[in-house]
């Protein structure tokens, strides 16, 4: 295990640097071709500041945060997120987490993404089984 899951411990931060190209690639892989994720003009016509990250891409970033801390032998048991704000390509997306409780074999985590201003744009929780 590469991280010690103790109540109150912060998970090692993961910073992602999403690009417009990555959004197009993700659209192809996921089948989510909604134009707000790759067409600047369309996104702006809907009132957005420009193209935005796919919600499930941000969920994937958070799952990576958790599984990276978990290391080999552990298991992600439950995972859920709620989208609260926008993240834009070309701006860092910080993935953070906190151990809310830990027992001998399991830990409950709070996870979230932050924009560069420190606003939580995606919040969630996870349960992990420890090796």
Model feature map: region roles:
Residues 1-12, 89-131:
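HotDog/MaoC-like acyl-thioester-processing domains
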Residues 66-95:
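Mid-chain, well-packed structural core segment of small domains
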């Amino acid at each position: 295990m590469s991280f010690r899951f103790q109540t109150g411990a912060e998970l090692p931060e993961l910073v992602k640097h999403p690009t417009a190209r990555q959004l197009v690639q993700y659209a192809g892989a996921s089948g989510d071709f909604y134009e707000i994720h790759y067409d600047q003009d369309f996104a702006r016509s809907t009132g957005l500041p420009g193209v935005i990250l796919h919600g499930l891409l941000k969920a994937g970033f958070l799952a990576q945060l958790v599984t990276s801390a978990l290391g080999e032998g552990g298991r992600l048991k439950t995972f859920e997120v709620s989208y609260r704000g926008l993240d834009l390509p070309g701006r860092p997306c910080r993935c953070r987490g906190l151990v809310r409780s830990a027992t001998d074999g399991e830990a409950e985590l709070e996870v979230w993404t932050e924009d560069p201003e420190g606003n939580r744009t995606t919040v969630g929780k996870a349960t992990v089984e420890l090796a």
